[in-house]
From Swiss-Prot:
GO terms for biological process: 2-deoxyribose 1-phosphate catabolic process; 5-phosphoribose 1-diphosphate biosynthetic process; metabolic compound salvage; nucleotide metabolic process. GO terms for cellular component: cytosol. The gene is deoB. It comes from Staphylococcus epidermidis (strain ATCC 35984 / DSM 28319 / BCRC 17069 / CCUG 31568 / BM 3577 / RP62A). SUPFAM superfamilies: Alkaline phosphatase-like, DeoB insert domain-like. Isomerase that catalyzes the conversion of deoxy-ribose 1-phosphate (dRib-1-P) and ribose 1-phosphate (Rib-1-P) to deoxy-ribose 5-phosphate (dRib-5-P) and ribose 5-phosphate (Rib-5-P), respectively. Keywords: Cytoplasm, Isomerase, Manganese, Metal-binding. Belongs to the phosphopentomutase family. Its cofactor is Mn(2+). This is Phosphopentomutase. InterPro entries: Alkaline_phosphatase_core_sf, DeoB, Metalloenzyme, Phosphopentomutase_DeoB_cap_sf. It is found in: Cytoplasm. The keyword Cell membrane does not apply. Its main location: cytoplasm. Disulfide bonds: none annotated.
Amino acid sequence: MTTPFKRIHLIVMDSVGIGEGPDAAAFNDEGSHTLKHTLEGFKQKLPHLEQLGLGNIAPLPVVSKVTHPGAFYTKLSEASVGKDTMTGHWEIMGLNIMQPFKVYPNGFPEELVKEIESMTGRKVVANRPASGTQIIDEWGEHQMKTGDLIVYTSADPVLQIAAHEDVIPLEELYEICEKVRELTKDPKYLIGRIIARPYVGEPGNFTRTSNRHDYALKPFGRTVMNSLKDNGYDVIAIGKINDIYDGEGVTEAIRTKNNMDGMDQLIEVVKKDFEGISFLNLVDFDALYGHRRDKEGYAQAIKDFDLRLPELMNHLREDDLVIITADHGNDPIAKGTDHTREYIPLLMFSPKIKDYHELSQDTTFSSIGVTIADNFNVELPKYGKSYLKEMGVEHQ
């Protein structure tokens, strides 16, 4: 049996939601609409996303509705009970997460802090949500003098530990993070990722190094990626995908520096021979602009992505399928700094398909994984549905 598509390239525009989800009120996210609010007042067009049909999913500034879209289009709602990166990505690959990860907007509980101090023999300082650059500017010199651990979090379910590489050697920092990872698997903490955040430099001129390391939880079940790998297909993880799934189901992992490097790496992968999926996360939308409520920066990042699409399209093969989607929202005009509970856009196109239309809207993130699994004829997740029939493609 031949597969409809030999390769599927899945791109997650991290946090690029397309309007409040049906249960947004339960998350205090009524009225959230990342794309609409980001693009309001933006003066530039997004011609390639427009031609694909992004503006057909929902009315958007600077992105018009088109009569002949260049992709299948719809929007998907989230079934899982979280609105974080891991929950969104895990659901995309077929899981339904009913136990939400915990976030710590007021810092970590004293009980956990004491356990970390006891286990490591080092004092914990900071212990609050903060940007990584801000926290080392504030505590970096203190850390160099004392050897304390700078512990901080964000709007995501993460515990980050920053330390100067000359004060706490990398191997020791990694060992500390591994111990904290084990400690926080306890359901009463349930933190998604522990992140080592080493830095170098002198007071007033600290910089974080590329020696960051993430210690994630394994997905709470088998994903489509596991099924693909088990059946001999390639699963090429680009950007933070490998960390999000803790390597589960990944056959090759490629790190990226930023969104544009992510697109560079994807295009290099597209040029290679393989059979299976490439899976790219573009994190800058979320990390650099959404959480920081930087509307202008966010809009420009979407424009920059739009400009790269022709280059990607030029390297596609006849039996490739591209899927562009998101994992949650992060409305830059919403109160606070947290993610927002939103629908995600879904655009799917292939050189071998000429006529596109709207797909049904009655389903959830996991339908992406089901469609991929159906294409490669591997085990289908329990949740979601395949879009292959609606797309008019079948197994031969």
